[in-house]
Structures are given as structure tokens and as C-alpha cells.
A protein has these predicted regions:
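Start-transfer (signal-anchor) and selected internal transmembrane alpha helices
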Residues: 1-43, 217, 227-239
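Extracytoplasmic loop-helix module adjacent to an early transmembrane segment
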Residues: 37-77, 87-92
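Signature aromatic-anchored transmembrane alpha helix within multi-pass, membrane-resident enzymes
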Residues: 130, 184, 230-241, 425, ...
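Membrane-interface alpha helices of multi-pass inner-membrane proteins
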Residues: 182-199, 210, 235-245
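Membrane-proximal stem/loop segments at transmembrane-domain junctions that anchor or position
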Residues: 254-343, 534-551
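Short periplasmic/luminal acceptor-recognition loop of GT-C membrane glycosyltransferases, typified by
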Residues: 475, 499-583
Length: 621
């Protein structure tokens, strides 16, 4: 009995020692990852200021913060309502902080932190952990510096989804179901959060996330056993429940007739401006006359200032978008379009110089995974499945996604780079998981042990070579990548001087209301954490994606204007601002066709040091 108790005591102590070692290693991982993120964050903060990349994020921020309508509003149109409402709630509590930008910054660095911590769990020695952190930090710096400095919500959503896939795939399969679910709570939350931030981006990369899920499930010893089905069924169910609940709340929040009407207009606007070409008036005069639009009104589509004309509603927008799409189909048959898209895909994959380093990074990862799988096959037979179907499966899915966006005719960097990032992160997870799967194999004979030792040595060499190649690729790109960010940052600093003068002018004339020509302002962007002013802005755009929304109507009401056209033609405190390089003839012609006798009169100029940037026009007599 005494011997039994001693044995039990020793086993308990061994378990406690193992737990303490595990906790110590986790602490080391978190400290190293935290220092990595701190260094990257400090570098960016010292060298640059964080910017909103596009006007989309600026307007979304304005709506959420309250600077658009006067009160923080969760209906920011682009994001799903739950996360948008949450951010607006924080703004209601503290208005002076840039919560919107802070949220995205935390998302970015939080994803990097989670990936670094999980990666370091694959090694035990501190110097190996530091090496992994340094390599990942270099890759982040070299390939994602632009996305860190210039914040864009589409990229954030993709990074959240990719991180979730990474965490799911690198979860130890030897865990019990409860432990497995517990370890993947963060993965589930990240996917749901990505869906709320930018549902279209999450849906675009969701096939690659599904590939990860299928590959992970396939690693189970008994794939269709009850426990395996239950393990992954709960994960799938939780994801679907979160997505459905998020979408349900969003639909209820946008369920009013005004929002439904605007959403119809918004969808048609997206189709027209993002994927089609606005039909010219002279060649399509019969069509425009059939829907009641003259030439001066068609010009409003071209210069994006259609908000001035109340007759351009969701029905008119839908007809123009449908007509533009139909004309595009006539110009290029579907079969021909498919061939051109396929040709473009192979061009991007092999010949596009602008994406060559991203493609090199992806190819390196594919080759490394394949070689490691072949080597480890000597120890664990099913590891060859990486070569037989996992890598081809991932490549086929990524090819379909690329073909889709190419066929749609719109491949901005925020989408293409997000696809690259997602693919690379998944391949990195496969690289790490191969080492764990090899260690999982029980050694049953001396011969197998020798094979295992020899193969492990070969695999370590492959890992080292892969790391060296990745570091070399990153170092090769780092100088040019940094220079690119420097140039873009300096360009924005110079261009934004005009925008700052415009904002200062409007702020100095709070008793007046200004409507801005849309394309006079698209070149400008705002800093995330500098010059934060969340008070009501006394200017609005003549068009844009939020135009004619309930938020836009609230904005006009807050400014004391019933409609743009009525305001600029009848209210003496309402003005139009246009860049000095842009003509104002379109407004003169529009007013004439509408029966107004007034003409735009330049009454002020905005600029500094003798340089005129914007002209201020008065129409009302």
C-alpha cells in the first residue's frame, strides 16, 4: 500500500512538474511575442503615423464616431451592425479617442501576436523561439508594412479569417474534444468578427478556411468516428450560429423601408461603379431619355455627384447598372471573357512583376511543405497526403478564387494581397504541423528509430533551408517595400496639406454649410490618431456611397438642409466647394436644365502661401 501511494505521489509530482514547465514555456512565448509586436508597433509609430487607406474607412469612422450626423451611429453601411454598434457605443462613452482606428490596429497586432505565440509552441529552446519570432517579424515587416501603416478594413477582415484558420490547423489533435473546443474559441470569435467587419472578404476567403478544416479533420485516426464528427461538428455549428446571428441582427437593424430602399440603391451603385462602365450619353441617348435623364443628369453619374438630383433614386440606379452590364456582355462574349480571365490568371501567377515577390513567397511555401511531407513519409505514412491531395486541394481552391476576382474585373491590392496573406499563413500552419505530426509517431523498432533520426535530421535541414530562403526573400523585398511605404506616406503628407486647409476653412465658418465635389476630395486621407475631431462636420459630399442613405438624411437635417438641390439654390448659408483644377460647368448646365436662373459664383478661395487649392461657390441669391 505504501509503495502504491509513493508511486501515485511521484506520478502526481511528474504531472505538476510538466504543467509548470508548460506554463513557463507559455509565459516565455507570450513575452517574446509581446516584445515582437511592441518593436513593430514602436517602429511604425516613430517612423510613420497611421493613416486610413481609403475614403471608405474615413466615412465609416465619421458615421460611427458621430462627426457625420452629430451622434455616434451603428449604421455605418459597410460593416455589419453588431460590431459597428459596439464601436459607436464606445464613442458615446468617450468621444475624444479614435476608437475605430484603434480597433483595427489592435486586430492587426493581435493576429500577429496569436500567430507568433502558437508558432513558438512547436519548439522548446528559447533561442529557437526567438528565431521563429524574428523570422515572422521580418516577414510581417517586409510584406505587410503598407497594410499596417495604411489601415483598411477589408485587409483586417482577411487577416482575422486567416489567423483563425492558422489557429484551427495548428491545434493539437491529441487534445480531448472539450480541450479542442476550448483551444478554438478564439478561432471561432475571429471568424465571426471577420464576418462582421467585412462579410464579403470573409466569404471570399472562406473556401480556403474550409480547406483548412477538411485537412485538419482528415488528420484524425478515425475520420468518421462519432467523436471526430462531434469534434468538428461543434466547431462548424458554432461558426454558422455566429454568422447567422450576426447577419440576423444586421438585417433587423437595417429592416426599415428607408434602409431597404437605400440598400437596393447601394447594391446597384456598387455594380455600376465597381464592376461596370458608365454608358456615355451621346452613344446611349435613347436609353437615358427612356428613363427620364438628360445629359446634365448623366454627367452626375460620371462625376459621382448624383446626390444633388433627387430624381436619381434606387430604380434609376438599377436601370443604369443593368444597362451597363448588358452592354458589357455584348462587347465581350462569355467564352471570350473566360479565356481572357484564365490568361490573366497565369500572367499574374508567373509574369506579373508587381506581384513577383508574393508569388515567390507562396511557391517557396508550397515546395517546402511538399518536400517535408515526402521526407516525413518514412516515419508517418499518411504525411504524403500533403503531396497527394492537400496541397493540390489548396492550390485549386486559391486558383478558383483568383479566377473569380479576375473574371469580375476588379483586383485591388487590398483584395489580392489579402488572398496572398491567407494562403501563406495556411501554408505556414502546414509547415509547423508537419513537425508535430512526425513527432506523434510511436517508434516501434530500432530500425524505425534509426530511420526516424536520419529523417528528422534531413527535415531539420529542410526547415533551415526554407527559413534561410524566406529570410532572404524578405530581406530582398524589405528595402523596396520600406521605400514604397515611405513614398506613399510622403505623398499623402504633401497632398493632405490641401485637405487640412479645407477642413480648417470649414471649421472656421461653422455657421455655414458646404457641399464638396466628390472627386475633389478622393485624393485625401486622414491620420488615425492625430487631429482627431469627432464633432459634427459642417460639410457633406455631393455624392458617394453613403449618399441618399438614412444617415445622409440625418446629416442634412443636422445641418438644417432639406435636400442638396434646395439647399444650394435657396439657402444663403449653403455653398459648393470644388478643387481649383476641376471645372464647374457640370453644375452650371445642371442648374440651367432644371430651370434655375442662378449660376455658380466664386466667392472665396482656399489655400496658403499664394497657392489656391479649392474654390468656394455660391448659387443661392
Amino acid at each position: 500500500m505504501h509503495k502504491f501511494l509513493n508511486t501515485l505521489h511521484n506520478q502526481f509530482r511528474a504531472i505538476k512538474v510538466k504543467e509548470n514547465i508548460g506554463k513557463k514555456e507559455n509565459t516565455i512565448d507570450m513575452v517574446i511575442a509581446g516584445l515582437l509586436i511592441l518593436l513593430i508597433g514602436l517602429f511604425v509609430a516613430v517612423r510613420f503615423d497611421y493613416y486610413y487607406d481609403l475614403n471608405d474607412d474615413m466615412l465609416m469612422k465619421d458615421i460611427i464616431s458621430g462627426s457625420y450626423t452629430g451622434m455616434p451611429n451603428g449604421h455605418n453601411i459597410q460593416m455589419l451592425y453588431p460590431i459597428s454598434w459596439f464601436l459607436s457605443l464606445i464613442y458615446r462613452i468617450v468621444r475624444q479617442i479614435s476608437w475605430y482606428g484603434l480597433f483595427f490596429t489592435i486586430c492587426h497586432f493581435g493576429c500577429f501576436y496569436l500567430i507568433a505565440v502558437r508558432s513558438m509552441q512547436y519548439v522548446s529552446k528559447v533561442y529557437e523561439k526567438i528565431a521563429i519570432a524574428m523570422v515572422e517579424g521580418l516577414l510581417i515587416f517586409s510584406f505587410l508594412l503598407y497594410e499596417i501603416v495604411f489601415i483598411q478594413y477589408t485587409v483586417t477582415a482577411g487577416l482575422l479569417g486567416a489567423t483563425a484558420a492558422f489557429l484551427l490547423y495548428t491545434t493539437d489533435r491529441k487534445l480531448t474534444n472539450k480541450q479542442f473546443w476550448k483551444h478554438n474559441i478564439v478561432s471561432i470569435v475571429l471568424v465571426i468578427l471577420a464576418f462582421q467587419v467585412r462579410s464579403e472578404m470573409l466569404l471570399l476567403i472562406s473556401p480556403m478556411i474550409c480547406v483548412v478544416g477538411v485537412c485538419k479533420w482528415a488528420e484524425e485516426d478515425r475520420i468518421f468516428a462519432k467523436e471526430s464528427i462531434r469534434r468538428y461538428g461543434i466547431i462548424i455549428g458554432a461558426l454558422l450560429a455566429g454568422v447567422i446571428l450576426s447577419e440576423g441582427i444586421h438585417m433587423m437593424a437595417y429592416g426599415s423601408s428607408d434602409w431597404r430602399t437605400f440598400n437596393a440603391l447601394f447594391d446597384s451603385r456598387t455594380e455600376l461603379y465597381d464592376f461596370q462602365t458608365i454608358p456615355a450619353y451621346d452613344e446611349n441617348e435613347d436609353f437615358y431619355q427612356s428613363i427620364g435623364l438628360d445629359k446634365s443628369e448623366q454627367v452626375l453619374f460620371e462625376n459621382y455627384n448624383y446626390g444633388i438630383d433627387a430624381e436619381i433614386n434606387e430604380k434609376i440606379m438599377a436601370e443604369v447598372a443593368a444597362y451597363a452590364k448588358a452592354n458589357r456582355g455584348v462587347e465581350q462574349p462569355v467564352v471570350q471573357h473566360l479565356k481572357e480571365s484564365l490568361k490573366e490568371y497565369f500572367h499574374i501567377l508567373f509574369l506579373d512583376k508587381s506581384e513577383i515577390l508574393w508569388n515567390q513567397l507562396v511557391i517557396i511555401c508550397y515546395i517546402a511543405v511538399a518536400i517535408l511531407a515526402i521526407y516525413s513519409y518514412k516515419i508517418r505514412k499518411q504525411n504524403l497526403q500533403f503531396v497527394f491531395w492537400k496541397l493540390p486541394f489548396l492550390f485549386i481552391v486559391r486558383s478558383v478564387l483568383w479566377f473569380y476576382i479576375i473574371y469580375r474585373g476588379r483586383i485591388p491590392n487590398r483584395i489580392s494581397h489579402t488572398l496572398y496573406v491567407t494562403e501563406v499563413i495556411i501554408l505556414m500552419a502546414m509547415l509547423l504541423q508537419l513537425s508535430r505530426m512526425t513527432k506523434d509517431k510511436n517508434i516501434e523498432s530500432e530500425k524505425t528509430l534509426k530511420i526516424e533520426q536520419k529523417t528528422t535530421t534531413h527535415m531539420r535541414i529542410v526547415y533551415i533551408i526554407t527559413t534561410v530562403i524566406l529570410v532572404g526573400t524578405a530581406l530582398r523585398y524589405a528595402p523596396s517595400g520600406l521605400q514604397y511605404v515611405d513614398n506613399e506616406y510622403n505623398r499623402r503628407e504633401a497632398v493632405n496639406q490641401e485637405y487640412l486647409q479645407l477642413r480648417a476653412y470649414c471649421a472656421a465658418n461653422r455657421d455655414k454649410v458646404y457641399f464638396l465635389d466628390v472627386y475633389s476630395s478622393v485624393a485625401y486621407s486622414e491620420k488615425v490618431f492625430k487631429d482627431t475631431d469627432n464633432t459634427l462636420q459642417n460639410y457633406e459630399y455631393l455624392g458617394g456611397w453613403a449618399c441618399m442613405s438614412p444617415c445622409s438624411k440625418d446629416k442634412l437635417n443636422a445641418l438644417g438642409v432639406s435636400s442638396i438641390e434646395e439647399g444650394i439654390t435657396s439657402q444663403s448659408n449653403v455653398y459648393v466647394i470644388s478643387h481649383v483644377k476641376r471645372e464647374i460647368d457640370w453644375l452650371t448646365n445642371y442648374l440651367k436644365d432644371k430651370g434655375y436662373t442662378q449660376k455658380p459664383e466664386c466667392i472665396d478661395r482656399i489655400g496658403a502661401d499664394g497657392q489656391q487649392s479649392f474654390l468656394v461657390y455660391r448659387i443661392a441669391e
